[in-house]
């Protein structure tokens, strides 16, 4: 590390008033759809309907940003509008650093966000760089320009609740209720997911503005005045067999321990506060939000200490629920790790959601496949919904999800859809969407992407790769290989990030997006990318010894030299 202590901070702006919104229709701002697509999706990430704090470039997840600062944002936009189809833009932690001649089948944008040499991969070091304007936290889909609002995690949360219901309650959540906290960009999916799974939910959130937004977008049904009111509503609705979501404004570190003291018994307990980032994402008990934000600047070490201590009380309450026989699980925000660091030695006694409920899906390459209509026309999404049902006719669970999504999910920004499908299905759907663009059935191209939370694209020992069968939880070669393969296969843009979901030092992960513009060239790229991308997930799990993945690899004809030798 350099010993030069000179302040390297340059003139840059993190706050700017105004509204960013992606263009709609077929008129291009950039030269072709291959560059128009990343331009629109970048802007869509900052749409007020989508982003948590667009004036600060924050999309979701604490400080997950779409660009490092507004000067960088402007230069990214300028670069994309000028980019040719044989050039590639390089983005380093939200800053456009170079345009290079490549070729038409190469990605138009390559993105690396928040990556630090492992020894220095801590929030403390990252925050120093961030304060100097030398870094940006990209979360997962914030800095990779494929966030679609809370819908992006609704189905994954729904699948988790459904599987938990199958394991613990004979597949029936009617008359049951989920206790959780956090109504930000990710946590905001929980109330709707619980409702769709047939359960009531009590959702604690410390910011009233977030509750207001989730009620406005129909992710939350109603708000309780206080804990007594919330519990009365829960008792009423569960007795009636209704699946109603209830928000309660307060601090989970206060409310969960109080519920334990009262002997309240939820049917399921989890959490999706932004505990991964104690400096920016978790309000210490007894503090106001304004006090928290001000002291995060003036006393960062004290803020982190106070936030972690509150997390410890939160986790101790979750452990008490588990010890009372209530299914309790971590939903991927690293709150167990934070609590363990301040003395809760048994914080990991309750499992993460992936090993508990999701890993069998990952073994078959099934994960959060998503697409967005660049036209801005909801009819384009409804037509693709119908195409999914046509091409996957026998999956009643998937059809039910699509029907519920159309009925209950409000689009945020550009219309989009998510559905969990796997190896074989993704390429089939992508090629069909491309043909729909070619024929004019869709009014403009669509982009296909996914969360970085997928079967082959992440190493996260406290989340996606927790408790791997062979002990390879922390091996991060896999997301690097995924990014390299997607680049070689011709994805339109590819990203490689660090720290998403669980915070600095705890994850590495990659993403890809591909454009369906109706051309033959796009079809060739789609066939490669949408096969190879989920195939890396099957490969990764087969390599770890999972029989489901080994069988899937054989069924799909994957060439895995060390499997079945």
Swiss-Prot record:
Q: Which GO terms describe its cellular component?
A: cytoplasm
Q: What PANTHER family does the annotation carry? A: UROCANATE HYDRATASE
Tell me where in or outside the cell this protein is found. Cytoplasm
Gene3D superfamilies xrefs: Urocanase like domains, Urocanase superfamily
Q: What does this protein do?
A: Catalyzes the conversion of urocanate to 4-imidazolone-5-propionate.
- Does the keyword Magnesium feature in the UniProt annotation? no
Q: What is its EC number?
A: 4.2.1.49
Instruction: Show the ranges annotated as biased composition (Basic and acidic residues).
Output: 463-472
Q: Which GO terms describe its molecular function?
A: urocanate hydratase activity
Does NAD show up as a keyword for this record?
Answer: yes
> What is this protein's record name?
Urocanate hydratase
Which residues does the annotated region (Disordered) include?
Answer: 453-472
Gene source species: Pseudomonas syringae pv. tomato (strain ATCC BAA-871 / DC3000)
Q: Where does NAD(+) bind?
A: 61-62, 139, 185-187, 205, 210, 251-252, 272-276, 282-283, 331, 501
EC main group:
lyase
Q: Which UniProt keywords apply?
A: Cytoplasm, Histidine metabolism, Lyase, NAD
Q: Which HAMAP family match?
A: HutU
One of the GO biological process terms: L-histidine catabolic process to glutamate and formamide
Q: Which reaction does it catalyse?
A: 4-imidazolone-5-propanoate = trans-urocanate + H2O
* UniProt pathway annotation: Amino-acid degradation; L-histidine degradation into L-glutamate; N-formimidoyl-L-glutamate from L-histidine: step 2/3
Family in the record: Belongs to the urocanase family.
User: What's noted on cofactor binding?
Assistant: Binds 1 NAD(+) per subunit.
Catalytic machinery residues: 419
């Amino acid at each position: 590390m350099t010993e030069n202590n000179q302040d390297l901070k340059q003139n840059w702006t993190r706050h700017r008033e105004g509204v960013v919104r992606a263009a709609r229709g077929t008129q291009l701002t950039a030269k072709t759809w291959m560059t128009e697509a990343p331009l629109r999706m970048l802007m869509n990430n900052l749409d007020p309907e989508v982003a948590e704090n667009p004036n600060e470039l924050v999309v979701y997840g604490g400080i997950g940003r779409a660009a490092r600062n507004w000067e960088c944002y402007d230069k990214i936009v300028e670069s994309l509008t000028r980019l040719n189809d044989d050039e590639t833009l390089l983005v380093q932690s939200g800053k456009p650093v170079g345009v290079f001649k490549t070729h038409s089948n190469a990605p138009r944008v390559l993105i690396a966000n928040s990556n630090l040499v492992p020894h220095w991969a801590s929030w403390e070091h990252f925050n120093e760089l961030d304060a100097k304007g030398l870094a940006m936290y990209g979360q997962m889909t914030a800095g990779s320009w494929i966030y679609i609002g809370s819908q992006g995690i609704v189905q994954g949360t729904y699948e988790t609740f459904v599987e938990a219901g199958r394991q613990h309650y004979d597949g029936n959540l009617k008359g049951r209720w989920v206790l959780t906290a956090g109504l930000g960009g990710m946590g905001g999916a929980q109330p709707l997911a619980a409702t769709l799974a047939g359960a009531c939910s009590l959702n604690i959130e410390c910011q009233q503005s977030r509750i207001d937004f989730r009620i406005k977008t129909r992710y939350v049904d109603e708000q309780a005045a206080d804990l007594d009111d919330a519990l009365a509503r829960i008792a009423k609705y569960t007795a009636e067999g209704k699946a109603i979501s209830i928000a309660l404004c307060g601090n989970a570190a206060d409310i969960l321990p109080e519920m334990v003291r009262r002997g309240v018994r939820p049917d399921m307990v989890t959490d999706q506060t932004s505990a991964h980032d104690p400096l920016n994402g978790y309000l210490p008990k007894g503090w106001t939000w304004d006090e928290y934000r001000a002291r995060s600047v003036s006393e960062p070490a004290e803020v982190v200490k106070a936030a972690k201590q509150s997390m410890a009380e939160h986790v101790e309450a979750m452990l008490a629920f588990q010890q009372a026989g209530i299914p309790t699980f971590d939903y991927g925000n690293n709150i167990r790790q934070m609590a363990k660091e301040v003395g809760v030695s048994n914080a990991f006694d309750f499992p993460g959601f992936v090993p508990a409920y999701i890993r069998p899906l990952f073994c078959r390459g099934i994960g959060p496949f998503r697409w967005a209509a660049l036209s801005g026309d909801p009819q384009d999404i409804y037509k693709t919904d119908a195409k999914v049902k046509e091409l996957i006719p026998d999956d009643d669970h998937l059809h039910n999800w699509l029907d519920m999504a159309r009925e209950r999910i409000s689009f945020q920004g550009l219309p989009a859809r998510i559905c969990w499908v796997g190896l074989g299905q993704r390429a089939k759907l992508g090629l069909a969407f491309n043909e729909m663009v070619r024929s004019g059935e869709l009014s403009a191209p669509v982009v296909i992407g996914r969360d970085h939370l997928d079967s082959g694209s992440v190493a996260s020992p406290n989340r996606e790769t927790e408790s791997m069968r062979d002990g390879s939880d922390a091996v991060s070669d896999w997301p690097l290989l995924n990014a390299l393969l997607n680049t070689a296969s011709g994805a339109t843009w590819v990203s490689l990030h660090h720290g998403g979901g669980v915070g600095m030092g705890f994850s590495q992960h990659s993403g890809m997006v591909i454009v369906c513009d109706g051309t033959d060239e796009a079809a060739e790229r789609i066939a490669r990318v949408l096969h190879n991308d989920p195939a890396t997930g099957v490969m990764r799990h087969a390599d770890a010894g999972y029989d489901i993945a080994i069988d899937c690899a054989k069924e799909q004809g994957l060439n895995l030299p060390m499997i079945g030798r």
